[in-house]
């Protein structure tokens, strides 16, 4: 069973963001923040979040993601769960996970076969579904790392959102997002609530 439908919906909503338009390469990343600012009132900390979108054509792309989160207390557990929304155009190709204890020792490897799969609703006529993993570890702090790859085919109308801070009382050490597009293909994006958030945006072409 899924502990929090609200948490799942937040993960799903992140995918509902479209880009189209005018660039070759778009990079976004958080700037360095003092450790005391990161940990202040935090229940969890994103140690590193990395998203790389490789757009092969107007209809095909590969999204490679890596997420490392340290959970500081029980209130931060929701941030440690894994969710990946899929549909007839998006499919989860690769996945691996790892739980690391406070001493830096790997205590568990998580395989793709351990993920749960669920439809959004049996009453809806939709091909949408998602994979999830409910991460639990008895002592705090602990760290969980996920790496996964999603293939998008024949239905590419937008890309994932860049939301470094997904939960309240969550610190962010490092987060990056990069989109690479074929020559002649562009990308349009919109920034929301980035003022004062120490986020940089870089657009480049060719080998820049």
Language-model-derived ranges and their functions:
Residues 35-208:
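Beta-strand-rich, non-transmembrane domain signature
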Residues 1-37:
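Bacterial Sec-dependent N-terminal signal peptides
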